[in-house]
Amino acid sequence: MSKHSLKQSVRTFFYYSNMRLILLCLAASVYGCLLVYSAARSADNGMSGVIMQIGASIVGLILAMLISQVDYEDICRLWPVWSAIAVGLVLLTFTPLGLNVAGTDDTAWLGVRIGSFRLTFQPAELMKITFIITFAVHLSRVQQDIRRFKTLVLLALHAMIPIGLVFLQGDDGTALVFIMIFLSMLLVSGVNLLYYVLGLAGVCALVPLAWTYLLTDDKKARFLCILPPYIEKYLGTTGWQQYEGLKAIGSGQLTGLGYLKGGNGFSFARNNDLIF
């Protein structure tokens, strides 16, 4: 491609693009980098996280602009490719290549070292995008039968693939995100609301059984640690993050302490867990 044609392509892109959306994305990225710097500036190797955030923001904006030029139908046609890549990367976390990062107990990351920087990547984040694509394709193909129970079962089996993989990784929080994506997309697709009512009733009925026979003591503690009788008991273990969150909200309240004035330095991933 000649220099002239490249320049013309760039001009055409910006002419036909939603500049308001691009500027909002740019502003959100800059704001995010400033918050990461505020949260991580005093941490060991804190600036490496800031540099990676800036780099990721730049790469992300460029990729977003490039992908926006591709017809979404072409993206949907390649859903088997996206699924294979995302699931394959998640499966790699079950091999010796899988990593767990500081402050976590689940092996859900892959990593690569570039010079003095160690880049970590959580494949489940990519699988969120591919799940939205593949599930949207699935919904579009069964739209005429969306209210049939058999269709709902097949859709649920589709969702169980990423949800099950993430649960096996030990990342319950991300699995819940997949569940919410699944339920939200079902809701807007026109699924009979009666299924939601029946599902909610079923979950409520299963809670006592799950509490008694399925949940480990560690997972029970995650619920109990926010209740007054158990706060002190789990303060230094399971309830530590909830306690630190309450402190952060209590000290900053609605308006916050101010930029660069946050005093919490005890979080394993302060640029992530306590960024506010």
Regions found by a protein language model. Give the residues of each.
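Interfacial segments of alpha-helical transmembrane regions
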Residues: 79-83, 195-204
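Short loop segments and helix-boundary regions at transmembrane helix junctions
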Residues: 187-196
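Short amphipathic alpha-helical coupling elements at transmembrane boundaries
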Residues: 141-144, 151, 181, 185, ...
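Hydrophobic, glycine- and aromatic-enriched re-entrant/interface helices and adjoining loop segments
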Residues: 101-113, 117-120, 198-276
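Interfacial helix-loop-helix junctions of multi-pass membrane proteins
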Residues: 168, 172-176
